[in-house]
């Protein structure tokens, strides 16, 4: 059984090999891999083969099929990163992040991909601690893309978005995020 590649330049196995080669320089910065819609729709549902799980094993990082929490420890500080692939193509990327934050309410950083939007923005709120009001900062991040303007995006009249990625730096006292 052959899955249509709809004009893609490489066969799936070649895509996988080339992707592993391309991320080799940053593998030491990857905390884990989470599954997403492409691997579920194509490799898992049709073939019973989880390409993201195999990729995680190849590069030696944990694999998580579903969205969820990850604890990032920096010295004595524990930060809660909530991440997932995402599934909505909505124009407002915050809507899906709002849903995620409602379910995973203890998060410090909320990170989703899927819709190719690229941003990292703070959300400030007030918290009471020892009779003192303090600003509590959380982050909303959409992970970006490396595609220019794919045929499927043209077909659906999706907006053209800039290519790039988000960097998240967890520190002892604060979290910094920026787009590249």
PLM regions: where:
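Conserved beta-sheet core of the metallophosphoesterase superfamily
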Residues: 80-81, 87-177
């Amino acid at each position: 059984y052959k899955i249509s590649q709809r004009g893609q330049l490489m066969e799936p196995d070649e895509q996988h090999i080339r992707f592993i080669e391309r991320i080799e320089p940053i593998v030491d910065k990857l905390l884990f891999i989470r599954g997403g819609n492409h691997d579920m729709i194509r490799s898992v549902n049709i073939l019973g083969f989880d390409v993201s799980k195999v990729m995680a094993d190849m590069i030696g990082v944990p694999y998580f099929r579903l969205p969820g929490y990850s604890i990032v420890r920096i010295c004595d500080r524990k930060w809660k990163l909530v991440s997932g692939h995402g599934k909505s193509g909505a124009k407002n990327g915050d809507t899906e992040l709002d849903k995620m934050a409602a379910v995973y309410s203890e998060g410090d950083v909320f990170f989703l991909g899927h819709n190719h939007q690229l941003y990292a923005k703070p959300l400030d709120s007030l918290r009471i601690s020892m009779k003192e009001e303090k600003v509590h900062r959380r982050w909303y991040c959409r992970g970006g893309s490396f595609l220019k303007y794919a045929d499927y995006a043209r077909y659906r009249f999706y907006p053209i978005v800039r290519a790039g990625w988000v960097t998240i730096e967890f520190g002892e006292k604060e979290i910094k995020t920026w787009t590249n």
